[in-house]
Amino acid sequence: MEAVVIDAGSKLLKAGFAIPDQAPSMIIPTQMKIMNEDATLPDSPSQQANTVDPVVRGFIKDWDAMEDLLHHVLYDGLGWEISNEGQILFADPLLTPKAVKEQLVQLLFETFNVSGFYASEQAVLSLYAVGRISGCTVDIGHGKIDIAPVIEGAVQHVASKRIEIGGADLTKLFAQELAKSNPLIKLDISEVEKLKDQYACCAEDEIAYEKTLQSCNEEQHTLPDGQVISIKRERYTVGEALFQPSILGLEAHGLVEQLVRIISTVSSENHRQLLENTVLCGGTVSMTGFEERFQKEASLCSSSIRPSLVKAPEYMPENLSMYSAWVGGAILAKVVFPQNQHITKADYDESGPSVVHRKCF
């Protein structure tokens, strides 16, 4: 049986057997619904259920909910059988606390009785997915942006940075902007997210964005209840916030400048391999015009440091950026488990959860 690869994001959990040139067989909401104190499946139709988020801004926060979610994924979704569990490779977010790593390995060995475990950081795995071991990843997730330089398969943690904004924050911004221009229409956040996915885009540059504030074509969208909503400059504001964080009320540099500053803190002998191997990942990077805007901002850098993007190999699945860490995990699983580089049950029984820091790095 192939090892299972899991990448649990704040919005979506990606899981499947380690087949590198295929998309993960399960891509499901991480958020769960709770009814009568019992966790139901993520797609429960109940209208009265409360929701719980096992993962918040990349890190596991609700371990009971995570256990329920993993049980559904492994046994119901992927067909594991009790007492015949297999191996798991987990994609770790940047800067995962040691205590979280230990609790995860404890959960998997003691509750799920896995036969083997390995974890690697998402930044490293995303590079593996495009055939690189060195480079810099810009991962725009649902609840955070991680920028991480990686040299020879090792994340440079001192230089790495997490920015506490993500797709969810852009959705809230879009909701606020739509409410200003459509004050009589009430939208729930799930409707706003669908509208964002359909209409949000990036202007060509800051000058082009300023022009949209003065004049912008109007889109008319009919909602399921028959109401018609007007969408104009709001769709550009969402993308612009990544390059002008002041739109979100943040005193921070734009995405490309953040990347350049991070690379500049790494030894100059590594600048070139980091610059020439910049990888964009996360669902938000598929926003219309985002990649072009990123490249234009990079070309305008006054610094000698000018990032260039790595394209996904043609043989990789479409929309690779949405689950590149999972694909990289599938590639790595083909190495670590056959070569016995993983944590075995015997390793865990001998050393306990702390073995994860010695065997997975």
Predicted regions and their residues:
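A short acidic Gly-Thr/Ser loop motif
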Residues: 6-12, 130-132, 137-145, 150-154, ...
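Phosphate-binding glycine-rich/basic clefts of nucleotide- and phosphate-handling proteins
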Residues: 151-252, 277
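Catalytic phosphate/nucleotide-handling subdomain of diverse soluble enzymes
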Residues: 269, 279, 287-311, 334, ...
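Glycine-rich phosphate-binding loops at beta-strand->alpha-helix junctions
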Residues: 92-100, 108, 200, 204, ...
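Phosphate/ATP-binding catalytic cores across multiple sugar-kinase/actin-like superfamilies
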Residues: 69-77, 237, 241-274, 293
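Acidic, glycine/GT-rich loop-and beta-edge segments that sit at the periphery of enzyme/chaperone cores
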Residues: 185-197, 201-218, 307-361
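Conserved phosphate-binding loops in N-terminal lobes of ATP-dependent enzymes
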Residues: 2-107, 116, 146, 157-159, ...
